C-alpha cells in the first residue's frame, strides 16, 4: 500500500464518523520532518517556501506550490496543481475550500503532533476553512503496528532484557572487585551491547546513580558522572530497535523495526533500603494495573483512552501517598520512533483522548521521584487483534531474568546473577 492509499484509507475511516473533507499537509522551508516522513519525502530536500498537499478521502490529491519551487512534490500523486507567488494568490486558491473541514497536524492537547504553524492556521480560518486535529488519523496511519512491526519489537525487547542482565552482571563485577564504577562506564557498556546485537537508538541510555535517579531524564556528563557508592539506587532506562527487519514478505527494510523501551532498578549493595522497597512495590502495582484494566475493558467491549489509563495509574500512586513525587505521564506511544505517533498514556501533561486500539503499542513507566532517589519500572505493551494486552519481550527466557521475573517485581541487588 502506498502512502497515498494508506492516507485515504484512514481518512475514509474518519470521514465515516465525522465531517472530514480531507487531510491537509504542509511544510514551510523544510522544517516539518514529521510531514515529510508521512509523505515519504526526502528529509534533506531544500525548500524555502510553503507547499500544501490536500488529500481527500476519495479522488485526486491537490498540490498547491510556490512558483519558485514547482517541483517539490513531484514524487507524489496528484495532477491537479495550483501555483502562487503572493499571499493574495495563496488566499484565492485556498478560498475554494471555504466551509470544508480539513485535518491538520495540530492538536490543542498534543504538541508532539502539532507541527503546523499558528500563522498558517489563522490564514486557513480567515478563508472560512474549518480545521480539525489529525491526531486520530496519525494514530491510524503511523501509530498502529503491523504484525512485522510487532515481531521486530518483540525481538528488540528480548535483546534489551538480555542487555539489562549483562549490564547488571557488569555492575556486580565491579561491586565485588571494589573497582570504582561511574555512570559513564555503564552507559558505554550498554551502547557496546547495542552495537553487538545490531540495535540502533536515537540517544544514549539513562544511567543514574543515587540522587541522580531523582531526575527522570538525567544526562551522564562526559567526565564520567557519579561513582557508585554502597546503597546507591541505580536506574537503568534503555531503548533501541533493530537496524533492519523483514516485512513478512521477504523484503528487508529499515522502515519495519519498532522500538522497545524498558527500565529496571537496582541497588549497589546486597540489601534494599526499606523505603526503596516500599516505593518500588507501589510502582509495580501501578504498572501491572494497566494490563489488568485493558483486559477487563476488552472483555466487556468498553473502549479505553490513554488519558483514562494514566489517571488510573496516578490514582494508585496518589493513594499510596506519593502523588507529589510524580513527574511525568505513565507512558508514550511507540512505533518506528521511541516516542511514536500513537496513543500516549497521558491524562495530565498532554491529555490524550485517543482510544487504545488493536495494534497500539506504548510504554508503561510509572515513576516516583524524591530528592534522595527516584525510580521507575518500565515495560512495553502492544494490543493484539482481540484487544488484549501483550508485554513485549516477556516470553524471553520463559519470562525470567535470572531469578527475577519479567516484568521486574523486585529491586536488583549485587547478590543477583542475571
Question: Which functions belong to the PLM regions below?
Answer:
Residues 1-418:
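Active-site neighborhoods and metal-handling regions in enzymes and metal-associated proteins
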Amino acid at each position: 500500500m502506498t502512502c497515498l492509499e494508506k492516507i485515504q484509507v484512514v481518512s475514509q475511516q474518519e470521514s465515516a464518523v465525522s465531517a472530514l473533507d480531507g487531510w491537509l499537509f504542509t511544510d514551510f522551508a523544510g522544517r516539518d520532518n514529521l510531514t515529510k516522513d508521512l509523505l515519504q519525502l526526502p528529509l534533506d530536500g531544500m525548500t524555502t517556501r510553503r507547499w500544501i498537499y490536500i488529500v481527500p478521502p476519495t479522488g485526486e490529491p491537490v498540490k498547491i506550490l510556490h512558483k519558485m519551487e514547482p517541483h517539490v512534490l513531484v514524487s507524489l500523486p496528484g495532477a491537479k496543481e495550483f501555483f502562487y507567488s503572493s499571499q493574495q494568490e495563496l488566499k484565492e486558491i485556498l478560498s475554494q475550500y471555504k466551509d470544508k473541514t480539513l485535518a491538520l497536524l495540530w492538536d490543542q492537547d498534543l504538541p508532539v503532533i502539532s507541527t503546523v504553524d499558528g500563522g498558517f492556521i489563522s490564514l486557513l480560518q480567515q478563508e472560512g476553512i474549518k480545521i480539525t486535529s489529525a491526531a486520530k488519523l496519525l494514530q491510524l496511519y503511523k501509530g498502529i503496528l503491523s504484525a512485522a512491526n510487532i515481531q521486530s519489537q518483540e525481538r528488540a525487547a528480548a535483546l534489551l532484557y538480555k542487555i539489562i542482565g549483562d549490564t547488571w552482571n557488569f555492575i556486580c563485577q565491579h561491586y565485588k572487585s571494589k573497582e570504582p564504577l561511574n555512570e559513564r562506564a555503564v552507559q558505554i557498556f550498554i551502547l557496546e551491547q547495542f552495537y553487538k546485537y545490531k540495535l540502533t537508538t536515537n540517544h544514549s541510555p539513562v544511567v543514574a546513580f543515587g540522587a541522580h535517579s531523582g531526575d527522570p531524564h538525567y544526562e551522564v556528563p562526559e567526565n564520567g558522572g557519579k561513582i557508585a557508592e554502597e546503597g546507591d539506587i541505580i536506574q537503568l532506562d534503555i531503548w533501541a530497535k533493530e537496524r533492519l527487519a523483514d516485512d513478512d514478505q521477504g523484503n528487508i527494510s529499515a522502515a519495519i523495526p519498532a522500538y522497545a523501551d524498558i527500565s529496571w532498578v537496582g541497588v549497589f549493595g546486597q540489601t534494599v533500603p526499606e523505603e526503596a522497597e516500599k516505593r518500588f512495590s507501589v510502582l509495580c502495582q501501578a504498572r501491572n494495573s494497566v494490563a489488568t484494566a485493558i483486559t477487563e475493558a476488552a472483555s466487556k467491549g468498553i473502549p479505553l483512552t490513554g488519558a483514562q489509563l494514566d489517571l488510573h495509574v496516578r490514582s494508585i500512586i496518589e493513594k499510596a501517598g506519593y502523588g507529589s513525587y510524580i513527574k511525568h505521564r505513565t507512558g508514550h506511544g511507540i512505533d518506528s520512533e521511541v516516542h511514536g505517533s500513537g496513543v500516549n498514556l497521558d491524562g495530565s501533561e498532554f491529555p490524550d483522548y485517543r482510544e487504545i486500539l488493536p495494534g497500539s503499542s506504548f510504554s508503561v513507566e510509572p515513576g516516583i521521584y524524591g530528592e534522595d532517589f527516584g525510580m521507575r519500572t518500565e515495560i512495553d505493551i502492544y494490543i493484539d487483534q482481540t484487544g488484549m494486552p501483550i508485554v513485549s519481550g516477556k516470553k524471553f527466557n520463559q519470562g525470567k531474568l535470572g531469578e527475577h521475573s519479567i516484568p521486574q517485581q523486585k529491586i536488583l541487588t549485587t547478590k543477583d546473577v542475571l
